[in-house]
């Protein structure tokens, strides 16, 4: 119903509030999470009152999934509307295949940012902890105002996602705002596979 209402209103995003970690965990039960991942409209999830009124710095995690390239339109939107700068956190993968895909995603996003004169910097994750945890801790230590992530493409994995990286980031312990976008259906996504581009 939320997604349909937002579509009828031609909303550009859905803002959803929670009350701390427990509220976030309750929110992302199977039914509500299905709403989030099935909506074509991005969700902006907030756990409390923002520390600032501006979105100056946005953390943009990039891993091996091809869906990362779909963030481009929202990078442009956020930059133009909020004047935001982006910190690209590059996943520190050891697998050669993953490294190749990560570099491809980085090159694509970097070309887009340069082409639209958007301020950014690239930082490689340390790899000392899981990428999902490093995303959250990095955002906290670097005062990011927003984390921009993609949801898992295949809606059939909604129950699995209760323990997936997206769930941890959305319900992060630092109450950081997170914008969650959903990949386009496979048939609309330039040949991207429904399983997440692996």
Task: State each model region's role.
Residues 38-39, 49-89, 95-116, 141, ...:
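Short acidic/Ser/Thr-enriched loop-to-helix initiation segments
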Residues 1, 128-132:
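Charged docking surfaces used in two-component/phosphorelay signaling
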Residues 44, 87-89, 121-126, 142, ...:
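General small-molecule cofactor/ligand-binding pocket signal
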Residues 3-51, 140-193:
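Gly/Ser-rich helix-loop-strand patches that form or flank binding pockets
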Residues 25, 68, 128-129, 162:
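A conditional alpha-helix N-cap/helix-loop micro-motif detector
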Residues 20-22, 64-66, 92-97, 126, ...:
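Short histidine/acidic/glycine/proline-rich micro-motifs that form metal-
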């Amino acid at each position: 119903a939320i997604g349909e209402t937002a579509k009828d209103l031609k909303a550009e995003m859905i803002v959803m509030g929670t009350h701390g970690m427990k509220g976030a965990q309750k929110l992302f039960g199977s039914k509500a999470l299905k709403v989030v991942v099935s909506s074509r409209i991005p969700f902006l999830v907030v756990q409390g009152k923002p520390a600032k009124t501006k979105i100056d710095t946005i953390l943009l995690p990039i891993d091996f999934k091809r869906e990362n390239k779909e963030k481009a339109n929202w990078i442009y939107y956020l930059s133009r509307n909020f004047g935001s700068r982006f910190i690209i956190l590059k996943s520190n993968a050891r697998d050669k295949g993953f490294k190749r895909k990560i570099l491809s995603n980085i090159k694509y996003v970097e070309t887009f940012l340069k082409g639209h004169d958007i301020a950014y910097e690239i930082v490689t994750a340390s790899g000392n902890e899981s990428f999902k945890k490093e995303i959250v801790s990095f955002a906290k230590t670097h005062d990011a105002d927003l984390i921009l992530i993609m949801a898992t493409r295949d809606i059939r994995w909604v129950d699995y996602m209760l323990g997936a990286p997206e769930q941890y980031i959305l319900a992060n312990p630092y109450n950081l705002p997170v914008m969650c976008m959903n990949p386009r259906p496979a048939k609309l996504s330039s040949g991207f596979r429904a399983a997440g581009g692996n």
